[in-house]
């Protein structure tokens, strides 16, 4: 491990493994599961994992901004960390943490979840780590240096026909018609229950693509999007635009203003191998 952002990568890997140890300890041994909104839950594993990750980062980078799913912004808001305060430059150094992506799976004893830790420099993701403790599998990427699984480089699958593709999707109510329209055009669709893992899997060719029209937060995307991109996938927003930028315009800003300060889930994703990405984008626009 050498080169730019070596220390950030080392800290992220160490933090993710600490969180993973907590999750292994508590998996199928939870005493309480607390509802969080209509579709989500939060557990002791989320809180303890997040505290462990933040502690590991603070020990080495005490001045960095942190945005975490459960505790929110530490010294910065979500929008400031990505887009900067009122349109000025983004925060120079910011970490985006989802301590346990796939909490519903975790709470129900389904071993599909991960810790996701991303680091962005002036609003641009440059380090990403996903750790799946159930498989002891670590995906990581550094911008410009490719992506790896447990230290072994990986890349997107070779080009193939859309009808051979396995797509990751999210089965939210507003997206069901689109999923139904896509289903006959591909081999199969799957909702893994962890957006971060699904996006990372595109970079490693386990999935050929992932589509989510909204409902994503920066901590879902920072690490996973970079890993997919460094694995050779094309990563964009659902409409083909930049993937780590909040939608612009008064309506988009008003919608985010109605969200709690650290829960602006206004991002989207379309991730696939380059040739497949273009076909999927055309289908979604059609």
Give the role of each language-model region.
Residues 1-100, 281-286:
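N-terminal subdomain of lithium-sensitive/metallo-dependent phosphomonoesterases centered on the IMPase/IPPase/PAP
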Residues 19, 23, 46, 57, ...:
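Residue-level signal for inorganic ion chemistry
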Residues 29-33, 185-192, 234-236, 286:
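Short secondary-structure junctions
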Residues 146-149, 153-155, 174, 276-279:
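Short helix-loop capping/hinge motifs at secondary-structure junctions, enriched
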């Amino acid at each position: 491990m050498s080169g730019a952002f070596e220390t950030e990568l080392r800290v992220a890997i160490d933090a993710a493994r600490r969180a993973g140890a907590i999750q292994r300890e508590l998996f199928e041994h939870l005493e309480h599961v607390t509802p969080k909104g209509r579709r989500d839950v939060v557990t002791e594993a989320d809180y303890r994992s997040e505290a462990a990750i933040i502690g590991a980062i603070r020990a080495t980078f005490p001045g960095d901004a942190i945005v975490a799913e459960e505790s929110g912004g530490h010294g910065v808001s979500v929008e400031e960390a990505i887009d900067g305060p009122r349109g000025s430059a983004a925060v120079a150094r910011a970490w985006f943490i989802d301590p346990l992506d796939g909490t519903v799976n975790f709470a129900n004893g389904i071993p599909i979840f991960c810790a996701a830790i991303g680091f962005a420099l002036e609003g641009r993701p440059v380090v990403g780590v996903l750790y799946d403790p159930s498989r002891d599998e670590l995906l990581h990427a550094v911008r410009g240096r490719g992506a790896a699984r447990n230290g072994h480089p990986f890349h997107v699958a070779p080009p193939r026909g859309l009808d051979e593709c396995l797509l990751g999707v999210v089965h939210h109510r507003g997206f069901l018609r689109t999923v139904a329209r896509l289903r006959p055009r591909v081999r199969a669709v799957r909702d893994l229950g962890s957006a971060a893992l699904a996006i990372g899997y595109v970079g490693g060719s386990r999935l050929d693509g992932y589509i989510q029209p909204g409902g994503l937060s920066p901590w879902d995307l920072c690490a996973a999007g970079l890993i997919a991109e460094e694995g050779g996938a094309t990563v964009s927003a659902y409409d083909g635009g930049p993937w780590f930028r909040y939608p612009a315009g008064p309506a988009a800003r008003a919608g985010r203003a109605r969200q709690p300060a650290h829960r602006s889930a206004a991002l989207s994703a379309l991730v696939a191998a380059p040739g497949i990405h273009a076909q999927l984008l055309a289908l979604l626009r059609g």
